[in-house]
Amino acid sequence: MATKADKKNAIRQDIIDSAGIYSQNLAGKAFLYVYGEEFFEVSFPVDHFLHLTGVETKLSAKEFYKNAKKAKLTNSQFYFDARHPYANARKKLPCLKRLPELTNDMVCILKDMQTVTIIYKLSVTNLEFTLGLTENTDANGNKINDFFLPMSLRVEDTSVEKSKNGEIIDFIFSKDASIAKYDTLLVEDKNKMIPDSIKHLISEKLYSTEHD
């Protein structure tokens, strides 16, 4: 039977693996989700990685991520408590490794998903796991920009029932966060046209070649 130390080692390895995937596929990029005429943008800051792991730490969120990415995170640098139980982390981490699926696969957008503590205005789900998004605000609640940021990874399957409504995505675009326009198309519904409402955000090559 796995000892407490074995269990913690396994969690640590999962966090390290997840940080590598987050770093390679999500950090430093921006994603544009489009459904009907509506759209929103998501970025994945490095200091939001910790929220998604389900563990607690005395390190700053940035330090935690940096240590995990460099595989230097030690078992003494994170712990479990009543708000961050071991079972929760064990459930979340396999999904955290699969987080890029929510950017490059057909997903559903949920509006006003209610949890015990908060209502997430927008969430993205593949029906196996759900990423709750929060607006990018400063300490006083003022909006910094229009991006949504990842705040909560939920594995339970009741997110759809806890939301007001859901929409299947039509398109997902991505770009390097340092460039102005989205230049990569990751997901598309072939039966839909790119709406005019987002054309100012994407590279001309993506819609000039579009089927008439």
Task: Please give the residue ranges for each predicted region.
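An acidic, glycine-rich, mixed-charge low-complexity segment common to nucleic-acid enzymes
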Residues: 1-118, 123-125, 173-212
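Compact beta-sheet-dominated globular domain cores
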Residues: 130-189
